[in-house]
Amino acid sequence: MYIDVDNQKTYIATGSKDHIQGNMGITFIHGTAMDHTVWTLASRHFARRGLNILAVDLPGHGRSEGNVIPSIEGMADWVIKALDASNQDKSIIVGHSMGSLVAFDVAARYPDRITSLAMVGTSIPMPVGDVLLDNAKADKHVAKEMVNFWSHSQSAHLGGSQVPGTWMLGKLIRLLERSGPGVIYNDLKACQDYSEGLERSKQIQSPTLLIL
């Protein structure tokens, strides 16, 4: 569904189910240069268990309008605005990679809005190598190839999907290629620059699941 956040058209996938007023929400936040589609299976699973799904496209990603946000804190503030625009008072929050930092920052600074936190493929801090950053800044395709390569295990490189015919590396590289100019650099730089994580961990009040 589309909502309005900061006067910009914003896309939120709902797992093909309408939101039900009063139901618990679960907010999914994608990683660098990705979009809501990485959460398709999880969204459908939890939607069919009665949760209101908010798999967001951050500004400048996927189907959402607007410029990319240059900081993790800024993205976290935006997520709260998206919850407000969706009339979702409280939510479970789940993030992958860059999205895990955003989810973490939301949980740390807005504890009254978050009931539990899940962080997938995460690290605090989340340093990014100079070679990757330089290639991303130059908007070279090799930056997307690096992200794709390092995002999959050895078994996935050999076609280790449980779904016959699924090519995980091929799917991700096409997703990264759909991102606009400068998006991958913006997101990687935001991860690199997020220096408040260890200190903010003291503010986390909600139960937290790490999937590493």
Which role fits each region the language model picked out?
Residues 101-149:
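Flexible "cap/lid" loop of the alpha/beta hydrolase fold
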Residues 33, 58-62, 124:
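Alpha/beta-hydrolase active-site loop signature
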Residues 134-204:
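Conserved alpha/beta-hydrolase catalytic His-Asp/Glu region
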Residues 22-31:
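Short beta-strand element of the alpha/beta-hydrolase
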Residues 204, 210-212:
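Short beta-strand/loop motif that positions the catalytic acidic residue
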Residues 31-34, 97:
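Active-site glycine-rich loops that stabilize anionic/oxyanionic intermediates
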Residues 2-15, 40-48, 52-98:
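Active-site loop/oxyanion-hole signature of alpha/beta-hydrolase fold enzymes
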